[in-house]
């Protein structure tokens, strides 16, 4: 296994991404970035990045996935983490006095049922942990943030309500991406890819039939518009496979019936 020295991540100290890094890569240096574009753009031949790509409640993290597919980076590991959101205020704050909640857009979506019950203003910001730290700058007990329950150990803040996600089974998938395989997982039985169908009837269906013929199980199929090409779409695909020979056969067959097919990752999984 290659030693990982530096990992870039989107967010700030105390974020879910940082908690994943601390659990899996204790010896690496962590570098916080404000945007996914910056996070992925900083990766050199010896560095890596960790990005959240999908949540079990609200789906794909579009900005992360878009930037990943436009980069020349590959996915080398999937990490799945259970997410426990909490409503957090400054020490002494009371939930009945809260008038506004701030957090990352994904966190606000994942807790929408709870927030609708409060009937208060919601303000999206770039990071869950950053939203908590901004409470110190605002210095008001009428604003709360949504982030991880691990802030309960910080005496500057108080947990106003635990477990506020729309469903207790709330998980996020993270990808470790880079330019060289760190060889962290012995079994690489998952694939992520991007497919662009030809602009003719039946192209997508023909492509999907090839997966069936090769007995490959699709676990994700999601369409996204192609920027600059109105009404044309690309498809994010995940499928199960651990044979490079089958991947090669798949690519050869798909080139005959689609405009583009690119595998962006061959990886295994870790559950936290």
Where are these regions (language model features)?
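Domain-level signature for soluble enzymes in the chorismate/prephenate branch of the shikimate pathway
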Residues: 1-272
């Amino acid at each position: 296994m290659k030693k990982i020295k530096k990992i870039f991540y989107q967010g700030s100290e105390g974020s879910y991404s940082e908690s994943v890094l601390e659990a899996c890569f204790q010896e690496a240096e962590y570098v916080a970035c404000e945007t996914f574009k910056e996070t992925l753009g900083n990766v050199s031949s010896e560095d890596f990045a960790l990005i959240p790509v999908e949540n079990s409640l609200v789906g794909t993290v579009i900005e992360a996935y878009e930037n990943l597919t436009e980069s020349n980076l590959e996915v080398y590991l999937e990490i799945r983490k259970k997410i426990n959101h909490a409503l957090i205020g400054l020490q002494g704050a009371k939930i009945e006095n809260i008038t506004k909640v701030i957090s990352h857009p994904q966190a606000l979506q994942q807790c929408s049922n709870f927030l609708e019950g409060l009937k208060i203003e919601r303000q999206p910001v770039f990071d869950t942990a950053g939203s908590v730290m901004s409470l110190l700058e605002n210095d008001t007990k009428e604003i709360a943030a949504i982030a991880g329950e691990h802030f309960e150990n910080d005496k500057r803040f108080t947990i106003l309500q635990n477990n506020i996600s729309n469903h207790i089974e709330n998980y996020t998938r993270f990808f470790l991406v880079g330019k060289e395989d760190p060889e962290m997982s012995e079994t690489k039985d998952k694939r992520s890819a991007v497919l662009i169908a030809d602009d003719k009837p039946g192209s997508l269906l023909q492509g999907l039939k090839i997966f069936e013929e090769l007995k490959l199980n699709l676990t994700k199929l999601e369409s996204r518009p192609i920027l600059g090409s109105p009404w044309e779409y690309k498809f994010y695909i995940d499928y199960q496979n651990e044979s490079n020979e089958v991947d090669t056969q798949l690519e050869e067959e798909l080139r005959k019936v689609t405009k583009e097919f690119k595998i962006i990752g061959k990886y295994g999984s870790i559950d936290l």
